Amino acid sequence: MNQEIKEHGYKLAPICYTYLDPIGMYSKKIKRLDELKKGDSIVIPSDPSNGGRSLLVLEAEGVIKTNVSKGQIPDVGDITENKLELNFVKINPADTVKTLDDYTAAFINGNYAFENGFIANRDAVCREKLSPDDLSTPFVKVLVARAKDQGRAVFIKVISAYQSKGSAQVLKQAEGGALIPAFTY
């Protein structure tokens, strides 16, 4: 969102957290990370946010290391250690699922994975480890409004209705149980 605001000059403000949707790595060629071989090619989303998330997942799993000064959004050029000499191919996020026949693995956003029959909890080789207790991640989904309107009564009602036990139950069942409510109820 911050990138969109910067690029287009939108005057938006987050009004509430909604849910977390972990990105996952999927493959038709491997089932576990330890099956990766030297020189394998991994597809990551081409947008900076999701590409960075993908690299951070591999870093958390001990596959690569990135320059810590890049924070939450490292790029391929920020990889400081890559013992398997993995090749990273950037593809439009909506198209990453189409690459599974051609590459060792692909990082696929949760919504695209689910739309194509994948269940993150069952099918991902590895996935982002997100917690509803840590909302400092820049990858939490938010509802936004125009900055000048964020305090309007209608939005207070929307937030109250959305951040409810019923909504949390629906989210926990969505996408095969992959979504994580990002609010307390």
Where are the model-predicted features located?
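Short helices/loops that flank or line small-molecule/ion binding pockets
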Residues: 6-7, 56-57, 77-113
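Periplasmic-binding protein-like
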Residues: 52-59, 160-183
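Pocket-flanking alpha-helical
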Residues: 1-9, 25-26, 31, 114-117
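A local structural motif
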Residues: 38-39, 63-90
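A bilobed periplasmic-binding-protein/Venus flytrap-type ligand-binding module shared by bacterial periplasmic
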Residues: 22-33, 138-154
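Short amphipathic alpha-helical coupling segments at ligand-binding clamshell hinges
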Residues: 38-40, 150-161, 170
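Short beta-strand->loop
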Residues: 11-18, 89, 109, 114-135
